[in-house]
Amino acid sequence: MPALILRVMTLLLLGSACAQAAQDSNADLYDPVAPANSAFVRVLNLSDSNVEVTLSGKNKPQSVTGGQFGGYRFVAPGVQRITVAGQVLEHELKANTASTVLYRDGQLQLIADQFVNEPRKAQIAFYNFTAKPAALKTLDGQHVVVDMLEHDQTGSRMVNELKIAFAAYAGDARLVDFDELFLKKGRSYSYALLPAGSGFRAITLANSIDPTE
């Protein structure tokens, strides 16, 4: 089962990252391949500025744009030291898991991502980083995709391959729309609901792996 989990997670996350690297004339001939029982971790930078992320076990830092997710990086399981803009978080990352480290107001918080062993489906992860409980629904609000989440919670759902857009709802109130994406089987996608002034904003992302060592 652990080998299956690793294979599925790699398929879900890798996506276009390898294809993009292969097209880059400066890319290394061989990209790193995640060893068995790896842990995966990324940063969501909710500051207004780009931040530098360092990770124990990795040689090069990662730059994460303000207001965006960074790519997942794979590391050996165990206690890892994650540094974002000078702030340090040490956390035990378990084998065959994925985590998102939230950088917000100068503080770090780790959120355990959810994965399902089903490469024949597309996986949706919904994050609610607002104070208002919210659910992910189809645009018309008729179908719930991920049930109501409280502040700083995440939930997931497996769906068939299709092109679709979603929206975040608080009850019957439509808060914000997410970009339309073609959800491909064997891939994973992140939908994040964030505060923006007196309203809300959305991040829609096809997840990827950053293979930088």
Regions found by a protein language model. Give the residues of each.
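Sec-dependent signal peptide recognition
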Residues: 2-11
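Hydrophobic h-region of N-terminal signal peptides that target proteins for export
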Residues: 12-21
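Intrinsically disordered, low-complexity polar regions and short flexible loop motifs
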Residues: 22-213
